Structures are given as structure tokens and as C-alpha cells.
UniProtKB/Swiss-Prot annotation:
Cell compartment(s), UniProt: Cytoplasm
Record family assignment: Belongs to the 'phage' integrase family. XerD subfamily.
Protein's name in the database: Tyrosine recombinase XerD
Catalytic residues (UniProt): 156, 180, 250, 253, 276, 285
Species for this entry: Rhizobium meliloti (strain 1021)
Amino acid sequence: MTDMSAAYVEAFLEMMSAERGAAANTLQSYERDLEDARSFLRSRGTGLTDASADDLRSYLSHLAGQGFKASSQARRLSALRQFYKFLYAEGLRTDDPTGILDAPKKARTLPKTLSIEDVTRLIGQAEAEAKSGSDDVMAKLRMHALIELLYATGMRVSELVSLPASVLAQNGRFLIIRGKGNKERLVPLSQAAIRAMRAYGEALQEESADSPWLFPSNGKSGHLPRQVFARDLKSLAARAGIRVAAISPHVLRHAFASHLLANGADLRAVQELLGHSDISTTQIYTHVLEERLHDLVQNHHPLAKQAKKQD
């Protein structure tokens, strides 16, 4: 970036990191989005720090014309809102041009998920391979632990792969997860997840006792990259006879939430377990609640029972 935009964006990113605990991925996303907006505005002879509300509307219209989904437009507008709020708070602008902009309307698509039967097959495949004693047993123990932990807790894949090795010492029925914004939450573990983690942990102590990560690797981060886990998960799904296109770590997170709600869990409790700061994010799962209520009425309402008998 040129002129003062570079310095202001750098100061903004430093603030987001130091004061709000933004993760590296979040900071990179902000930087990319602000750079894209700056490039568009520069082509119109306007600087990023001097843009008006009309300039920013033109930018959003440009994104729509380029075929960006409403969710992608909304994400970039969110980055701009944060940036201009920072400039206003620091006295670097006398106004916030994003204050009068409407957010692009996002379609509330239902998340992909897996049936309980498919999850059972997936976990069963991972468990069988971990117990087979064949080659590369460490990788198979790791995959079994990853799958059990993900489905037991519903944590984000970034939270899963970056778990510290110290969780092995907790030796309890709960796991402390450090999520977005450095916020911590407590999630319960299933007995199956505890067993899988212990089996993997014992093997890990023999192979990588000095690593600070539960799932260490030789990569830059020091822990298993989420892309590697996603790739290995698809391979496992193929061996389990599950459609590869239907599987990803995020789909398992959705399965965790959907299966809990389908079996009577409270929406607020699921919100806490998922680490959603706003209940509206969790409300995308309300279709599960609607199906459960429909089944409840059909199976237990006296008139519905009577109609079934007549059929």
C-alpha cells in the first residue's frame, strides 16, 4: 500500500492483534480485504482512508457485478467497518462512512451434515484401522483421536489441530478449548473420545514427547495443518464407503450440532458448545428443531394418533 493507507492499515492490524486477540488467519483476511478495496478505490482516484459512503457502495456493487456471493460481500464490508471505526476512534477521520451502509442480504443456506449412520461408519473405520496394528499405526491412532474429538466436541478444525499437548494431562471428562478471540470454553468429552485420545497420547509420548502440540507436524505452524486433516478425512471417508464430496471437518462440526438438537439438546447449550458468540449464528440449525417438533406432534398428539389408526 502507498501513502498513509499503509501505516493506518498496519496500525489497525496491530490493534486487532494486541487488543482483541485476533488470530493470524483473521488478520490475513482483513489485510487481503482492505487491499482489495484500496485497489478498487485507487482506480477511481480515491484513497482508502478518504473514501466516502458512495465510494464504498460502488465497491460493493463492483463485487456483486464480479459474481461475489452476498456472504463474501458482507465479510469485506465487515472488514471495512472495523477499519473505519478504528480510524474514527483514533481521530484519523471525523466520520465513519460505513455507518449508513446496508449489509448485503445473505441467503440462509442449511449446512451440510452427515447422518448418524454415516458418522458411525466413519468412526468405526478409523477405530478399526487404529487397532489393526498395520503400517503407519501412529497416523491411524491420530486420525481416530481427531475424529472422536471432533464429533464429541464440535470444535472448529482450527481449534482441533492446534490443541496443546497439555490436554493429555487434564485426565478428565472435560476439555478446555481456546477459540476465536482467545475465548475459552469448557466442553464435555465422550468416553470413546477419551479412550482414543489416551491411546494416541501414549504413542505420542514415545515418538514426540517434546512437542507442545497434541498433533505435531514438521510444518511451519508446528502442528497438523487443517488442510492435511481435511485431505486425510476424505481418504478415510472413501475407505468407509461414504461419498467423499459430502465430508469435511466442518461437516462433522455441523453433524455434532444437528445430532444434539435432534436428540433433545437446547439451542442455547449448543451455542455454548460451538463457541458462537451470537445465538443468531446457531439459529441456522432451527430446521432440526422444526423437524423434531413435527415428529413430536405426529407421534404424541391424540388427534394425530387417531388419524394414524384410521389410515
